[in-house]
C-alpha cells in the first residue's frame, strides 16, 4: 500500500504531475496583473513596521512564557526554523517555537507530524500562538501583516505560472478569503484567493482582511472550522487545472 504521507512518495507524484500537465496548464491559465502603487511601495511597509513593533512589545511576556514551556517540554533547540519562499522567490527563514518531538520509528525515520505533535503544540496551533514570532519577520521586512501564507521551497516547482504570481508580494500572517464562500481551506481556494489579492492589494483591502483575521481568531466557531479543515500537502494540479493534495 502506498503511503501518501511519505515525503519521498509525495515528491515522486509531484514530479509526475508537473511533467504530465504543468505546461498545458500554464498555456491555458489567465495571467495575473500586479500593480505597484504608492501604497504597496511605501505605506504598507510603514504600517507593517508600526503594527509589528507594537505587537512584539505586547506579546513579549507571552512569548517568554511560551519559550519557557517549550524548553521544559522539548528542551533544546527552542525554535523550529525553515526556509520559506519570500517575495520575488527570495528565501527567508521562518522561525517558530518547536511544537513537535523528534520521535522516530524502528528504522530511525521521523514519525508522521501528527504523531510527533505535543499537547502544547496542538494548543498553540489551534490558538495561533505559534504565529506570534512571525511579527519579528514582519518587523525585519521578510513578511507583511497581510499576504499569502509562506510555503516551503519544495513546493515551488509544483506551482503553475498563474499561482507563482503569489510571490509578487510579501508573504503574510494570513490572506483571509475575500469571498466568504471560500472560507474552507483547500489549496485551490487558497491560491486563487492569493492571486486575487495580488491583483487588488490596497489600503482598503488590507484593512478589510485585518478585520477578518481578527474575527477568525476570536470567533470560536469559525476558528474551529478552519482548524479542523485538512488540506494535506500540495502536490500539483488535476487535468482541469485545479490544485490538489495528497488527501484529495
Label the model's feature ranges.
Residues 1-29, 133-248:
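Hydrophobic structural segments characteristic of membrane proteins
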Residues 19-23, 80-116, 174-193:
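Short, glycine-rich, amphipathic interfacial segments at transmembrane boundaries or analogous
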Residues 27-42, 112, 116, 131:
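Juxtamembrane loop-helix boundary motifs flanking transmembrane segments in multi-pass membrane proteins
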Residues 31-102, 208-248:
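A hydrophobic, helix-centered structural microdomain
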Residues 36, 103-119, 123, 152-158:
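Cytosolic-biased juxtamembrane loops and peripheral soluble domains of multi-pass membrane proteins
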Residues 87, 123-126:
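Feature for secretory/organellar precursors and membrane-associated catalytic proteins
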Residues 125-134:
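Short acidic-aromatic low-complexity motifs
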Amino acid at each position: 500500500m502506498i503511503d501518501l504521507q511519505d515525503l519521498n512518495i509525495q515528491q515522486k507524484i509531484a514530479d509526475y504531475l508537473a511533467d504530465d500537465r504543468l505546461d498545458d496548464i500554464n498555456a491555458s491559465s489567465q495571467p495575473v496583473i500586479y500593480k505597484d502603487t504608492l501604497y504597496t511601495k511605501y505605506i504598507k511597509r510603514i504600517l507593517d513596521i508600526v503594527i509589528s513593533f507594537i505587537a512584539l512589545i505586547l506579546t513579549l511576556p507571552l512569548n517568554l512564557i511560551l519559550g519557557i514551556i517549550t524548553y521544559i517540554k522539548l528542551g533544546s533547540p527552542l525554535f523550529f526554523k525553515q526556509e520559506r519562499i519570500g517575495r520575488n522567490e527570495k528565501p527567508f527563514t521562518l522561525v517558530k517555537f518547536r511544537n513537535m518531538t523528534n520521535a522516530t520509528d524502528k528504522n530511525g525515520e521521523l514519525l508522521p507530524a501528527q504523531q510527533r505533535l505535543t499537547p502544547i503544540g496542538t494548543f498553540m496551533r489551534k490558538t495561533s500562538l505559534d504565529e506570534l514570532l512571525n511579527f519579528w519577520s514582519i518587523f525585519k521586512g521578510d513578511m507583511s501583516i497581510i499576504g499569502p501564507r509562506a510555503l516551503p521551497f519544495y513546493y515551488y516547482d509544483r506551482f503553475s505560472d498563474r499561482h507563482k504570481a503569489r510571490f509578487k508580494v510579501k508573504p503574510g500572517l494570513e490572506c483571509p478569503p475575500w469571498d466568504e464562500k471560500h472560507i474552507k481551506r483547500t489549496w485551490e481556494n487558497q491560491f486563487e484567493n492569493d492571486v486575487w489579492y495580488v491583483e487588488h492589494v490596497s489600503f482598503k483591502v488590507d484593512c478589510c482582511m485585518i478585520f477578518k483575521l481578527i474575527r477568525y481568531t476570536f470567533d470560536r466557531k469559525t476558528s474551529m472550522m478552519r482548524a479542523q479543515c485538512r488540506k494535506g500537502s500540495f502536490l500539483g494540479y488535476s487535468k482541469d487545472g485545479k490544485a490538489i493534495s495528497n488527501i484529495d
